[in-house]
Amino acid sequence: IEDVPNLLKNLKTIMQPDSLLIMNFLGGKTLSELQKQLIDLEIKFYGGASPRIMPFIDIKSAGMLIQNAGFRMPIIDSENINITHSNLLDLFHDLRGMGQTNCMSSVSIPLRKKITTLLEKKLTNKNKINTTFELITVTAWNN
């Protein structure tokens, strides 16, 4: 979703008065390991980086967005979930299944085999690739 403030305002409009909003979304720490390594490798080989991972909202920004949309008494919590994959292809397959690939509207340079090979080496620890998914939960009342 590229326009979160508008989404929240629309949700507030369609919700019944005094109803509870409960929503979950991936937070700013999601895929941080992958994102850092991708950026470092692309800068090294291409002199710049393409947007490959959707920008995620951090917990502080989530609170501000909820309040700016007019919801009241927000409670926001986050939990980091660590997921292990056996290789980079399995990770990419799961991301595709979650709808988290090619979700940026801007065009990026395709990943080259050289980059993916080095990326897998940098991310692999004890024959596993560990990634973090931050799950942010928001509850707030519509006045």
Predicted stretch roles:
Residues 5-20:
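A short glycine-rich, Lys/Arg-flanked "PGG" loop and its adjoining helix->strand segment in the class I
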Residues 75-143:
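Conserved Class I S-adenosyl-L-methionine
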Residues 1-2, 29:
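Catalytic P-loop NTPase motifs of RecA-like helicase/translocase cores
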Residues 18, 22-86, 102-105:
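Conserved catalytic/acceptor-binding region of the Class I
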Residues 6-9, 36-39, 89-90:
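Short, glycine/charged-enriched secondary-structure capping and boundary segments
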